[in-house]
Amino acid sequence: MDYNGVLVGLGNPGARYEGTRHNCGFALIDAFVDFGYRHGTVDEMNGGKFSCQLWRVRLPRLDGCWLAAKPQTFMNLSGQCVQPLLSWHKLKAADLVVAHDELDIPPGELRFKFGGGNAGHNGLKSITELLGTPDFYRLRMGIGRPPHKGDVTNWVLGRPQGEDAENLDHILPLALDVLFAFADKGLDSAVRLAGKTTRPRKPVRQTANAEASNNSPEASATPQNKDNT
C-alpha cells in the first residue's frame, strides 16, 4: 500500500511517563488517531517488528493514507523504530513528520520546519543518526523552559499543572490543523499556520522538582542503560 506520509510522535513508553511534557508527541498521535476514528478510517497495525504502536489512518483532509506511530523504545532510541519503519514501507526521510516537545518554544505555541539541528533533543538525535540525514519534517510543540537552571530533566519528565497544562492541551487541535495544512498545501502553509499560534495566557509554573515529586515519582531516575530524555 502507498502512504502519503508517516507521523511519528515522540515519548517514553509506560504509565510513569503518561502526561509528561516529554510525551506530548504521544498525545498528538492519540488525538490524530481519535480524529481518524471519528472522521475517517483507522486500522490498528502490528508494529512489533518496528518497536512501536502503529496505525493506518485514512482521512479526506489528508487526501490519502498516513501511518501514525508511537515508538515503544525509550526516547534516545527512537531511531530504532523510525528507520526500519520507513525502510519496510519504502518511504524516505522526506516522507516523515516527527512531533516532539520543544523547550525553546513557550507552552501553547507551535513551529513547523524541515531539517535543521536537534537542539539537544535525544529523540531527534537518534532519528537523525539512524536515518543518516536531518532532512525530515518537525512539528515542534512548545513546553517552555523550567524556571530554574539545571532542572531540565525533571521539567520534561514532570506533568504540567494548572494554566501550563491548559496551554499544552490547547495546542493539540492546533497541531492537527498544522498537519492537515501541510498535507493539503505543503510546507509554507504549515509554517505560516504554526507561526500564528500564541500562548492563551502566561502559565504559572511550579518548580520542576516539585512537579517531579508530586506527579511523577521516580521520574528523574534513568533506567539502567536507558535514557528517557
From Swiss-Prot:
What GO terms describe the biological role, i.e. biological process, of this protein?
protein quality control for misfolded or incompletely synthesized proteins; rescue of stalled ribosome
Question: Quick check: keyword Hydrolase in the entry?
Answer: yes
Residues binding tRNA:
Y17, F74, N76, N122
Q: Where is the composition biased (Low complexity)?
A: 207-223
This entry's Gene Ontology molecular function terms read: peptidyl-tRNA hydrolase activity; tRNA binding
Locations listed in the record: Cytoplasm
User: Would you tell me the Gene Ontology cellular component terms?
Assistant: cytoplasm
Q: What's its catalytic activity? A: an N-acyl-L-alpha-aminoacyl-tRNA + H2O = an N-acyl-L-amino acid + a tRNA + H(+)
Similarity section? Belongs to the PTH family.
Indicate the quaternary assembly.
Monomer.
The record, for NCBIfam families, names: pth
**What is the name attached to this protein's record?**
Peptidyl-tRNA hydrolase
- Tell me what organism the protein belongs to: Desulfovibrio desulfuricans (strain ATCC 27774 / DSM 6949 / MB)
The coding gene here is pth
